[in-house]
Amino acid sequence: MKPKIYLDNCCYNRPYDDQSQIRINLESQAKLFIQKLISFETLELVTSVMSYYENSRNPDKKHREAISAFMKKHETMCVTENDTIWNIQGTIVSTGIKEADAFHLASAIFANCDCFITTDDRILKYRTESIRIINPIQFIIEMR
């Protein structure tokens, strides 16, 4: 069975960030490698309505369209709003995670993803037994 992953919007946008910082550059390379694995169908990609909503707010049209096209082409599931997700989100928000980030996490948990991949340090500090939260670099290292 292929690992099922959820990439948050920080990951999708990481290759468009300033690559002069080593951490950003390494995270970008790891994220692009993850995209290749998704394209080769080695990994299963889960998205959500929040993924599309946040991406629609990206001011760079070229980046917005590229990200949207990748998600549409490769997603195996797009999680939509439902009471279970709202309940999970509420629990996560109560720990101090922002609402949009909590919706992403709740969507990944609802879809039974193996990993939630993010570059956001605040989310990386969040702990739950429901899903593994991991940086793209660490994800690649552990896949070996």
Go through the PLM ranges and name each one.
Residues 88, 96-98, 103:
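Mid-chain, well-packed structural core segment of small domains
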Residues 1-4, 18-28, 94, 106-144:
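Acidic, PIN/NYN-like endoribonuclease modules and their adjacent C-terminal/linker elements
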Residues 7, 80, 99-102, 118:
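Short beta-strand scaffold positions
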Residues 44, 75-77, 132:
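Conserved beta-strand segments of alpha/beta enzyme cores
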Residues 61-69, 128-130:
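Short, aromatic/basic amphipathic alpha-helical patches
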Residues 50-54, 71-94:
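Acidic catalytic patch
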Residues 1-47, 57-65, 137, 141-144:
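Short, well-structured N-terminal submotif of metal-dependent ribonuclease cores
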Residues 11, 51, 85, 104, ...:
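Alpha-helix capping/helix-boundary segments
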